[in-house]
UniProtKB/Swiss-Prot annotation:
Residues 313-407 are annotated as: Disordered. It comes from Encephalitozoon cuniculi (strain GB-M1) (Microsporidian parasite). Pfam families: DUF1609, DUF3654. Residues 313-345, 357-369 have a biased composition (Basic and acidic residues). Residues 346-356 have a biased composition (Basic residues). Belongs to the UPF0329 family. Residues 370-384 have a biased composition (Acidic residues). It comes from the Eukaryota. This is UPF0329 protein ECU02_0060. InterPro entries: DUF3654, UPF0329.
Length: 602
């Protein structure tokens, strides 16, 4: 729901219009093809929920301030930018603490919020100075600064609650008896909602709940940042994706200021309860889930996260045991080889032994040479042909050149290649396939999925030396009897004039011959919905596929595109862009995918 908050904040002047007719006329003009009904339905129900702030500051594609960043850690060229963001934090925090949207009443509530905030004396509290001037042990992290601002603003929550209650009571008394009964009833219900909310804000329990929830979020972000590289990368990319969405929304609204910490809905009671019972690990996963899915949490969310963590721990235990068993077997084989050599040397004469030893050395040398040849032949068989424009085939590389790019060579599972076919053919294969979740889909659904899955040109980037600048690798895990891992990038898909931000997902597993096999390739938008999505809070996992038939793979040898131009590929240091065109009229662009360079993480 965080992105809906951005829409609402960006559209303050429209949504606060006194006349509903003005709003309905202005929204379509500003939003273009956005689904107006969907937005208004969202804001109808999102008014009184609790909110939290994620303690990150981004500048372009770089996290310039993380939860643990101290002022001295910020580069000189970024300090002025960061200071400008921090100057606005007290107001951003205030809005996140008490802001509500109620149709027909937003303008005076917003005005009251601003009046209470502006009437507050900030003498002796300057967040920039607090962040800059602390020295030694008193030097604070950014997460600590955010909490200091929350505590300072907490002093005036009660004052705002009291003012809100008084003004609502006046409005209820002033309601005209001549008003139609249905309209009067609707207004009374909304005003009573606001009244109850204002009374809650006056209680110490509510004020403490706000601070506790935000403290847990800050601690969870620190925990994820310090836990390990995979969690650090995961939360950074999730925040980066949401910042890209904010940037797109605000640029469409001609509001260019982007970079301040993001605000999300997150049920305070559920978060605090989960933290008390399961501690920081579960809280961290819940924060990741909110960032990933842009949805509030509930008790079911907590249960799914707890189960997911237990499954992951069990998975890691099994992997560790399997690795230990492999190491023991390898040690036994080495010991047996040594014993065999000792027995062979005892029954021989010295001269013969010397000759035999030389012979053995030669034989071992030959075996090593053969082993190298075998490795090179396997390596030569694995590379995927580049998806060149017009079906051009790349120049054949020598075995030595290919061995240098060992990690860039992949085989492709046929479940990935099927998305290159027509929607009708794909539907036929899915309806008669083994994956139950794909059966019975309509042609319209297949065409929507094809736009997300038919991105085989991404393999050109995966095979390049630039791959690691655009994709991050996740840890390995077990699923369906195979060891899997994933590569995750960030992209923007544009089709029909609509831009969607999301992850470029690559799912891989190791074949019996040791080759890397791609079984999942997809652009997954941040607004993507699928069954069981909430059950998979882990970053980058492509768990929608159970057992995989290894026999159904291809190294793409001999593959040619149909005559004509399917796509054009351009690449720069910051982006890899694929543009798909109409093969009959290449001036018509069907869609495009831009894979962006991942944020620099220090």
């Amino acid at each position: 729901m965080g992105m809906w908050l951005v829409w609402i904040f960006a559209l303050d002047n429209i949504l606060c219009a006194s006349k509903e007719e003005e709003k309905k006329c202005e929204l379509p003009r500003r939003l273009g093809e956005m689904n107006i009904k969907e937005i208004t339905e969202k804001v109808e129900i999102d008014g009184l929920d609790t909110k939290i702030i994620i303690p990150f500051i981004f500048h372009d594609a770089k996290p310039v301030v993380s939860p643990i960043t101290r002022y001295r850690d910020i580069s000189q060229e970024e300090r002025r930018y960061v200071e400008e963001i921090i100057k606005g934090l007290p107001k951003l925090v205030w809005d996140s603490m008490v802001w509500i949207y109620v149709p027909g009443y937003t303008w005076w509530i917003k005005s009251l919020m601003d009046n209470v905030f502006n009437a507050t004396s900030f003498e002796g509290f300057n967040p920039v100075d607090l962040y800059k001037k602390a020295k030694g042990k008193s030097e604070i992290r950014f997460a600590d600064l955010v909490m200091s601002i929350f505590r300072f603003n907490g002093r005036i929550v009660n004052r705002f609650g009291q003012r809100l209650v008084r003004e609502v009571e006046v409005k209820i008394k002033e309601m005209s008896n001549e008003m139609p009964s249905s309209e009067k009833k609707e207004k009374e219900e909304r005003l009573n909602q606001i009244l109850e909310y204002g009374k809650k804000l006056c209680t110490r329990e509510k004020q403490e709940e706000m601070l506790k929830a935000q403290k847990i979020v800050c601690d969870a972000c620190v925990y994820l940042w310090e836990k390990g590289s995979e969690d650090r990368v995961a939360i950074t990319i999730m925040v980066y994706l949401r910042n890209l969405e904010v940037q797109m929304i605000r640029s469409s609204m001609k509001k260019v200021k982007v970079g301040e910490p993001l605000t999300f809905y997150m049920n305070h009671e559920v978060l605090i309860s989960a933290y008390k019972e399961y501690k920081i690990g579960v809280a961290g996963e819940l924060v990741k889930q909110v960032l990933k899915n842009d949805k509030d949490i509930d008790s079911e969310s907590v249960n799914r996260v707890v189960c997911s963590i237990r499954e992951r721990e069990e998975d890691e235990r099994k992997r560790a045991e399997a690795e230990s068993a492999r190491n023991r077997e390898e040690l036994l084989r080495m010991e047996e080889r040594e014993k065999g050599k000792e027995k062979g040397s005892k029954g021989k004469g010295r001269k013969k032994r010397g000759k035999k030893g030389a012979g053995e050395a030669k034989e071992e040398s030959k075996e090593e040479d053969r082993g190298g040849e075998e490795e090179e032949s396997v390596e030569a068989d694995v590379p995927v042909e580049e998806m060149a424009v017009g079906g051009a085939r790349p120049k054949k590389k020598s075995p030595k050149e290919e061995s240098k790019g060992e990690e860039r060579c992949y085989k492709v599972h046929k479940r990935v290649l099927r998305w290159m076919k027509s929607a009708e053919r794909i539907k036929y294969e899915l309806d008669n396939g083994e994956e139950e979740k794909w059966r019975g889909r309509s042609i319209e659904e297949i065409e929507e999925q094809k736009a997300l899955h038919d991105i085989i040109e991404v393999l050109k980037l995966l095979r390049s030396k630039e791959c690691d600048k655009f994709f991050v690798r996740t840890g390995k895990y077990m699923k369906g009897g195979s060891e899997r891992w994933n590569m995750v990038g960030v992209g923007i898909l544009e089709e029909g004039g609509k831009k969607r931000v999301g992850n470029v997902e690559v799912g891989l597993f190791e074949g019996k011959g040791g080759e890397n096999i791609i079984y999942h390739l997809m652009f997954k938008p941040t607004d993507f919905e699928e069954e069981g999505e909430g059950a998979r809070p882990s970053f980058g996992r492509c768990d929608g596929v159970d057992a995989i038939e290894e026999g159904r793979i291809s190294d793409m040898s001999g593959f040619q595109y149909p005559p004509g131009v399917r796509s054009e590929i351009t690449s720069s240091g910051s982006e890899f862009r694929i543009v798909w065109k109409n093969q009959r009229d290449t001036s018509l662009v069907l869609r495009s995918l831009t894979v962006l360079r991942i944020p620099e993480i220090r």
